[in-house]
């Protein structure tokens, strides 16, 4: 049941400005939400800062109630984006420097349990991993991290990585269409791509039966649903 999601108040939004100022929920007011994922305990939302030298944010909300718990201050000067949970760690895309940040789930649980409801600087507590493609969005499925690169016009690629022995190992590469902002897998392997570009053009949710179907014909999804502009990450 995701009915509570309509009540989540993300720090940095116009409706939360008073609380943000009083409780110091964010490092600056120029925040732009980008990614979302869920765990058994939390809803996690990323936001990058458009202010030079300011840090991005990872907001943590209680999954049962939607209550805001804490904000993790992330790396400076990064276009903080897609986010995924692999059961042990949370992975966050940093497209500007072509890295993924890994946050141990226990670290997030420890901060969330305190219910500080404020910004906590975590810039020195998180490890980075270089990847072979610019990470725009990410998801976890069947033991692998799938990292997709957004392009404006031409078809792009999505690379599957395995995390083993403290390293990310490239396993396979798939073709994807342009403008991909989010990716998610259903349990049966069906793939959902959120595609968008620009504030005045429609977004589209593109559905593929399998990875092989996506790779074979990236511009011909089995289903395409028109949506409002500016769709970003998608989660199931």
Name what the model sees in each region.
Residues 12-27, 67-73, 122-129, 167-174, ...:
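A short beta-strand motif characteristic of beta-propeller blades
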Residues 28-35, 77-84, 128-140, 177-185, ...:
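Repeated scaffold domains used in trafficking and secretory/extracellular systems
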Residues 40-42, 87-88, 142-144, 188-190:
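Short coil/turn segments that connect the beta-strands within blades of beta-propeller domains
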Residues 38, 44-53, 92-97, 147-152, ...:
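Conserved beta-strand positions in repeat-built beta-propeller and related beta-rich domains
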Residues 17-54:
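Beta-strand-rich domains and repeat architectures in extracellular enzymes and scaffolds
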Residues 111-141:
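Asp-box/WD-like beta-propeller blade repeats and closely related beta-sheet repeat scaffolds
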Residues 173-213:
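Loop/turn-rich, solvent-exposed surfaces of beta-rich toroidal or solenoidal domains
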Residues 52-59, 98-107, 153-162, 200-209:
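Structural motif
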């Amino acid at each position: 049941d995701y009915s509570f999601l309509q009540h989540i108040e993300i720090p940095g939004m116009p409706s939360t400005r008073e609380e943000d100022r009083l409780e110091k929920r964010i490092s600056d007011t120029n925040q732009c939400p980008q990614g979302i994922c869920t765990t058994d305990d939390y809803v996690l939302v990323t936001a990058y800062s458009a202010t030079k030298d300011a840090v991005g944010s990872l907001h943590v909300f209680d999954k049962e109630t939607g209550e805001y718990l804490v904000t993790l201050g992330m790396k400076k000067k990064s276009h903080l984006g897609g986010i995924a949970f692999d059961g042990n760690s949370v992975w966050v895309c940093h497209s500007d420097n072509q890295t993924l940040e890994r946050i141990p789930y226990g670290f997030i649980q420890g901060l969330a349990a305190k219910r500080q409801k404020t910004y906590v600087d975590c810039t020195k507590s998180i490890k980075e991993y270089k990847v072979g493609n610019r990470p725009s969005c990410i998801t976890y499925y069947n033991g692998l991290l799938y990292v997709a690169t957004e392009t404006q016009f031409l078809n792009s690629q999505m690379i599957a990585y395995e995390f083993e022995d403290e390293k990310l190992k490239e396993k396979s590469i798939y073709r994807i269409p342009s403008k991909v902002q989010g990716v998610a897998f259903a349990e049966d392997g069906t793939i959902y791509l959120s595609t968008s570009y620009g504030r005045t053009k429609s977004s589209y949710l593109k559905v593929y039966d399998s990875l092989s179907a996506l790779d074979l014909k990236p511009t011909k999804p089995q289903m395409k649903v028109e949506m409002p502009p500016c769709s970003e990450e998608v989660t199931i």
